[in-house]
Amino acid sequence: MKKQQGYAVEVEDLTVAYDAKPVIWDIDLKIPKGQLMAVVGPNGAGKTTLIKAMLGLLKPVAGTVRFLDGSGDIRALKNRIGYVPQSGSVDWDFPATVQDVALMGRYGKLGWIRRPRESDIELTNQALQKVGMREYASRQISRLSGGQQQRVFLARALTQEAEVYFMDEPFKGVDAQTERAIIALLKELKEQGKTVVVVHHDLQTVPDYFDWVTLINLRVIASGPVKDVFHEENLKKTYCGAGALLRIAV
């Protein structure tokens, strides 16, 4: 695939604080188009906060975020940016079927009547098939296991046909089979030229899963190709010398 030019996301001087205490501080970050990127760091480092601030879900104290064509208006780009939140942050008791949830990814592309077209339903069914959830289409989302629910949220992201995807710990709480299915999908999205940003906690799998990584602990410690920045020196800076975390295959 031909390498894309430019950046999917550009962040400058981004700071977010809770009760006057900074959670992320003076973040500068450029994410090239077409990368599969991990955001890693210790608990409380600000990984989820960074994602939410970039998406406009949290209001920063300072800083700017620009997407794709240089626009800072996330609302104008809602059809081009997809988001898969942590499964634990979702109200799974919401009365909706698997197909209903997956179809939500098409809402931004529907007309003012908001009635799904046959093509939307077909695309949704294809996405559910791809994540192995087609046979559960009529089941209530609340009746699924955590791994199955995560697959449905991935199907929703696929139906959106976005250009940039943000995923907050999509592997958390899933079994090995689901994890393999998820990473296969993420790599497929990358091959299609999409940009995928993933909050991730398993350092062991970073070299195999991702080609770009951002190390964060309040600030950005390092960001770049895995082969260049994912090494012991940067990990020590990120995890404050936590030796047990540094025994990784790099």
What role is predicted for each listed range?
Residues 103, 118-136:
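Conserved ABC ATPase "signature" region
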Residues 165-169:
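Catalytic Walker B motif of ABC-type/P-loop ATPase nucleotide-binding domains
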Residues 212-226:
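H-loop (His-switch) and adjacent beta-strand-loop-beta switch element
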Residues 200-201:
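H-loop/switch region of ABC-family ATPase nucleotide-binding domains
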Residues 140-144, 148:
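Conserved ABC ATPase signature
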Residues 55:
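Helix-to-loop junction immediately C-terminal to a conserved catalytic motif
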